[in-house]
Amino acid sequence: MGESRPLYMMIQDYILDQIRKGNWKPDDQIPPERELAEQFQVSRITAKAAIVGLVNKGYLSRQRGKGTFVAHVPGPGKSLERMPVHSAAEGSKKLVGLIIPWVEFRYFSLLLSGVEEELSKAGYHLIVKRITGLETESQTIEAFLGIPVDALIIVTSPGEHFNEDIIRLVLDKYPVILVEKSMQDIRTNSVYCDAGKGGAMMAEYLMGKGVRKIGLVTYPPRFTFGVKARIFGFQSALVAGGVPPLSDDLILSVTPDLLQRSDDPEIPEEIIRFLSEHPELEAVATVDAMLAKLVGKACYQMGRTDMRIICFDEPSYSKNSVYPTAYIDQSPVEVGRIAVRLAMEALEGQQEPKKCVIEPRLVELS
């Protein structure tokens, strides 16, 4: 495959070749990660992934504070021939890491079921870590590479920009699959729902029910590209339907920190205040199921049980709450399945990145 192979594998091939030729003998120290990264023009995180992979396979050993050395004897049944593309060829446990920020539990469980189902078919095991921010994301990536995992499926953290570690891994052709987000300028494997179309479907549903007094509860547009697309799609559909777009006072942006607290946070005061200031509202659209749950609880608490609520993602049941009348299904189970298929293709040497866009679906509940 030449240069089309993932660069961390090329580093592993180089190290094994030096050992096989006798250039590096048992107990010899190999070049540090920094030098290997410079030699192969890759990031240090990719060089580290290559080294740790060989340590875990018995070819190298690490000594704290000293460096990495050639092991005395390869593991049982090992040879110093070319390393396989992934650990499956050696019969070791095959692992894929899933990194996901704190999201509404129902969405998380559905996505997870799709990932597990497809990985089971492929004979892989799954390691999952829920994270709370970019710093935790970087730490988790490093920890997973140190295990090592064969591929990473990452539901990217909120924010306008990608974690630099993810960008480096993608550029170094490490098997990374992005969920819910795609890089604009760098080709990579990704799977996500058409958020703009989903936002439009929410507005069309409400207009179809004859509702005109509408509020929107969201996160700041910079929170994720998906949120920005949902808001744009929603507003565009209102205009196309002959309804003026929502003014700023009818759009509430809630701090995303509530997603990092628990699966059942307290009702934010700003939601109570928003509903109190707009007694005329007949319906509220929200950009995810967590916000729908909080709006529903607030409406129940305030006696506004006739409020029509629509959201993205299937809502989980919550007592003492006004339940949504409809939601936009992003097919999280299928998203999970596709993410795994993309990972398997990458591990099998498929070098052409794929961008898979899922069509949203409106599900009416009552």
Named regions from a protein language model:
Residues 202-244, 352-366:
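An alpha-beta-alpha
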